[in-house]
């Protein structure tokens, strides 16, 4: 999942709820703990390889941080019922999966020239050598920053986004991610790829970094001594750290291998997994 800029916490949460029967509000805080210990290795790889879009990173962080605080209160005060929370989780996952698969199933849709050119370069690079992927000289370079538009260059192509739109989206996502325990990157990443047509090779590091910072805030919020309906919101730190150790290795490997994997394959794998989980959790609400 780190190949697409997602920490994997959105898949870890259903595992904890279904297999471990861990359904109290503190499960969201435990997910934040996982992010804190798992993400740094992936972020390190993206920074080292020059594929960290810093302007995008700071906009995401600025928007999601205040949203996470509100999301914490939503989870603890209004989503304490496991059945209702699973339905909420299913709706979030359905959105993520549909965004990833949308442009894969649409026919006749012309991609932006920059995104299309990038895919063509990747195909040519693959055909030239068996181990070819994104070349080492392909790094993110910021070209222009303003309140209306931020532009950056990657592999000879120019990509841009509106920072105000991204900030508002990040704030809303922060609320959802704060309640869900994912930090928000799992929702922002497919939006950046599908709606803004930014390549996964450049947004993955930014969304992971944003998730890391907001997860620190989320874990602190959930660690506040607060008991609602006889249920504590305190994260299970040992469990979160244990998950994080495994995630640390997975994040590093995923970030390292990303430049060798086509974007289409990344979207298909993630999309199918997420859609399956979302349908499962939505249906359980009506049974």
Describe each PLM feature range.
Residues 18, 24, 45-173, 194, ...:
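Juxtamembrane transmembrane-helix boundary motif
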Residues 2-10, 27, 184, 203-205:
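Hydrophobic alpha-helical segments that either span membranes
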Residues 28-36, 61, 65, 204-215, ...:
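Transmembrane helix-bundle signature of multi-pass membrane transporters/permeases
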Residues 12-26, 187-202:
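Interfacial segments of multi-pass membrane proteins
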Residues 10-11, 59-62, 186:
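Hydrophobic alpha-helical transmembrane segments of integral membrane proteins
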Residues 1-5, 171-181, 214:
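Transmembrane alpha-helix interface/packing and boundary motifs in multi-pass membrane proteins
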Residues 189-190, 207-214, 218, 255:
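Feature representing long, continuous alpha-helical segments
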